[in-house]
From Swiss-Prot:
Superkingdom of the source species: Bacteria
Disulfide bonds, paired cysteine numbers: none
Membrane topology: Peripheral membrane protein
Keywords for the protein's UniProt record, in alphabetical order: Cell inner membrane, Cell membrane, Membrane, Metal-binding, Transport, Zinc
Main subcellular location of this protein, as a coarse class: membrane
InterPro entries: DabA (IPR018752)
Keyword Signal tagged: no
Protein name per Swiss-Prot or TrEMBL: Probable inorganic carbon transporter subunit DabA
Cofactor(s) listed: Zn(2+)
Amino-acid positions noted as binding Zn(2+) in the UniProt annotation, renumbered to this chain: 442, 444, 696, 711
Assigned GO CC terms: plasma membrane
Amino acid sequence: MELGRKLYIRSLVNVAGEPLSYFWPMRNFVYHNPLHELEGEHFSKAIKEGEEIFKGRAFLRRKDYIDFLNKGLIKEEKLLNSLKENVNLEGAPLTYEDLLRLIKDEKLKVYENTYLIREADTDLVEKLKGFFSENPKEVMENLFSEFGKKYTIADFVDLFFGESVNRTVNELLIKLSLDFLDEGQSVVEMPRRKEGFFRAFRELAKYNLRFIIRGGRELGELMESFEEPEEAIDNILKSYGIPEELWERYITLELAKLKGIAGYIKWRSHNKHYYFQRVYPSDLVEFLAVRLILEKGILEHRKKVYPFEPTYENFKRFFEEKIEEAFLTYEYATKRVPAELSSQVRENLKNAESFINTYLSRKAHINASNFALFLKDWLGERVKELSKEELKKVLEIYGEFQEKEGFIWLEALEDSLIERLTEGVLRANQEKEKPKAQALFCIDVRSERYRRNLEKIGNYETYGIAGFFGVPMAFVEIHKGHEEFLCPVLIKPRNVVLEIPKEMKEEYEVTHLLEHILHDLKQNVLTPYVTVEAIGFLFGFDFIGKTFMPYSYSKLKEKLLESKENVDYIINKPSREEVKELVNRVYETILKRVFEHEYGIKNPEKPLLEETLKVCLGETDYSERLELYGFKGEKQREFIERLRKVYKVDRGYWNILFERLSKLGFTLDEQASLIGRALKMVGLTEFAPFVFIIGHGSKSDNNPYESALDCGACGGASGLYNAIVFCRMANNPEVRKRIKEKFGINIPENTYFVPGLHNTTTDEVHFYDLEQFPQEVKEKLKEIKEDFDKASMLTASERYKELFDEEAEDELRKIYKVVENAYDWSQVRPEWGLSGNYAFVIGRRELTKHLNLEGKVFLHSYDYRVDRRGFLLEVILSGPAIVGQWINMEYYFSTTDNEVYGSGSKVYHNVVGRFGVISGNFSDLRTGLPTQTVYKEGKPLHIPARLIILLEAPYEFALSVINRVYAIRNLIQNEWVNFVIFDPESKKFYRYKKGSWNELKTEVKDG
């Protein structure tokens, strides 16, 4: 295959894969909008695209919205306004009250394809009958026009031949994909995985009975005929005769049939550093090629039983020349046939031409009768007075109403929520008292409850900030041996923090410490793998315990794990000279091992090691000292070449180690910038004696979605380490000095930053890293901890009602039950997570401090008065606000269609490959949130509304910043979020809706 064509196919597949969202490994669940790649489109257009590509619903059922209406979440006046905005009744014999009555009655609808149990008015049926007549030719033309947009060859084969090609392909491809993508769960490894997905498939399919039985000889021959995946894609699509202009969308449809696995492969292929991607490469091109080969092979194997060869032109000819048969088959397969005609249609599929007129007439009569009964129920006796033209208009209005009903409900819900929030903000009390202590919490909605209860107990001032606290870092927890990115997925951290045993840090400087970790190289069998990876584990290679685990280090680790009090952290960055010295020492240690174990040179002198390293690194051409040990001339050159190739002692690997170690820690200037910027962003410039930095995490047993309950701003991990590192930096006198110089923020000597963790499953808060404080400070912290414990009890008691359907007067019983939830391995719902989230407030705490937001609002502290140029607001709008929208959309779509966009019931979940879950023994990867997270007793607990972002800032200032941030501007203009600006100087609200900013009239109502 020529290179140009190959590159074209590859780029075509990558573009076609754009609508598919990433799926991250479950151990670091990352909230995302399932339609994230469609955010460049308006929300209303994107959800239609999602329906066509993924077959997913974007709105709830009417009865669910009616339930919201009855609970007061939706106000009737907002529902009426939404009807007026979305449905034009000009010239129709209807009122908006008629539509309101219709939308409020769950049973008031046309019951299509059901047996008639009542007699419809004959005259009315006759008037309506003509509106329900169908033209089979037009129906089939419209259907074929959607080929490549909504349907594939396999879809048409299943639809018109009564086959199950898609299911068969999915079964084979799911098993193949999960075996290939396995990350250590499977006992037997799939052969030839290292050669990539396509070649591993070709090898396996030769001998595997599943492929032989389903695809027969034809699949084997087809598979052998293609050496490259691009060649397979090109040839198979051409063999179907599909016009090339349809290929891009056609490929999208094929990939979307297993959107979970395809999304995971897409994520892996875009993250080349990911260990399993490096070792077992795969991409969408290979995945698509395998899918098309399986599909084509099965079609070839079954070709003899088909009425014609399934190609683009043959289906077109079938629709044109056998209209009646095609039409009736389509009607029957898609369940468009009225129930009472179903058996007759089945019997007459091969006699379609003579039966078609009878069918069309009877179907029109049945549908007209159904609609007549519906009109009678809706409009009463006045329907009899309507003329034929008026009935036609009513039918048109009803069609428009059906198309827009979900959007009508959504806008009414959002308008109601916005009114409730803005009314509450207007009641804000701006008075402030000198606080006893201050606390920074994550913006997570679950923090709102705790903050409110803590403020209620005592004079505490709380702030909200993204839960990585403005400190993006890769963190190496000692018992894991590999790095975690503790920051939003939008950010790739440049600095690494290392957790180590305290006794090691006390004994060694940084350089000596890291060398000590590698000390046991002398005691281990040397391999090329170990030489490179020996230090790599600090920065992302997960091999500790698998390949290289020195005994003394292992014992230190065991001791460390007994208590987190025995740990310390490398936060300060070593100098470049220190890093250079360390890398040289590592390589000298390796060289020493080589001399001793392979050449019998005991205790080689340091000058020999240094000179040998210089030659290996190309700093000198030859070593006379090596000659003294018998390495002369050609023998020396061969020796050096061996060191470079086998033991990786060369400039390239030296540079890699140097680069990785250079990422360790933060300079003092970096620390001052991070802490100063975070404090200024939330408006914290005057300090109480204690400032608590409270990260959050969750605790639940037997829960593959545990990371979905942790901190999204920390990449699905706990926020504890970010809190600890933040406090270590903020408590450093040298850092404080630089903060004062750079930001003008003076942190008093007697102010202490204390890290803590809020367990959102139990609502307990614990303080950490207390050994660094004097004894008198620890005593004061004990008193404050009592207040935090009281806040924990109040918050747990508040959450009890949502978690359990029972009443309990005993407060201790409530708290016990909530805590017990975390440790019950059979519990499918340890907590509600972020269910119910609907708003994101950016502003001072005084705006919402008086409100009970029920743990459903993100709260990000921000004071526009200290941000004259809007740079801090830019950071919030381009980071935390975007992550908030991702979370909101994950919950939104997991609620509107839990089977397609969510992950179904946890009861049927099985962990596969250590990276994902499937339902039962066979399904695509489940990508969204489980039913138990968003539903309670069959009803949605989450409120699926687009995120309401409320910003406190002067109107013109806010607009200028919004216009500078493309990501948020795009979401606003395409109406993926509802954006409201509260101008505190004019006390006015402004909202973006339907293409423009307008003042939002809000007033405080009595009660």
